[in-house]
């Protein structure tokens, strides 16, 4: 499973380093959605981390105020 975790975080790092700089900053949150997902994968594993990241991306739109939204310390059922 460590290999899958490293592959997932590596893909996010690739995006952060090479793709994201080519686009204007649009994330409404701190940390950014990609960094949030990377941290969630590191903390909770690939499946739960991607789930948390997906939920975060669904909230990242112009009608949401955004702001500081760190990865939770513990995984919740929601």
Curated annotation (Swiss-Prot):
Subcellular location: Cell inner membrane
The keyword Membrane is annotated on this UniProt entry: yes
SMART domains tied to this protein: Haemolytic (SM01234)
Positions of disulphide bridges: none
Chief place where the protein resides: membrane
Keywords: Cell inner membrane, Cell membrane, Membrane
Similarity section: Belongs to the UPF0161 family.
Protein name: Putative membrane protein insertion efficiency factor
Organism name: Gloeobacter violaceus (strain ATCC 29082 / PCC 7421)
Classification of source organism: Bacteria, Bacillati, Cyanobacteriota, Cyanophyceae, Gloeobacterales
């Amino acid at each position: 499973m460590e290999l899958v975790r490293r592959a997932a975080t590596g893909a996010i790092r690739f995006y952060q380093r090479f793709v994201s700089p080519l686009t204007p900053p649009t994330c409404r949150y701190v940390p950014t959605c990609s960094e949030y997902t990377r941290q969630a994968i590191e903390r909770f594993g690939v499946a739960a981390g991607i789930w948390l990241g997906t939920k975060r991306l669904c909230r990242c739109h112009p009608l949401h105020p955004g702001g500081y939204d760190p990865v939770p310390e513990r995984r919740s059922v929601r």
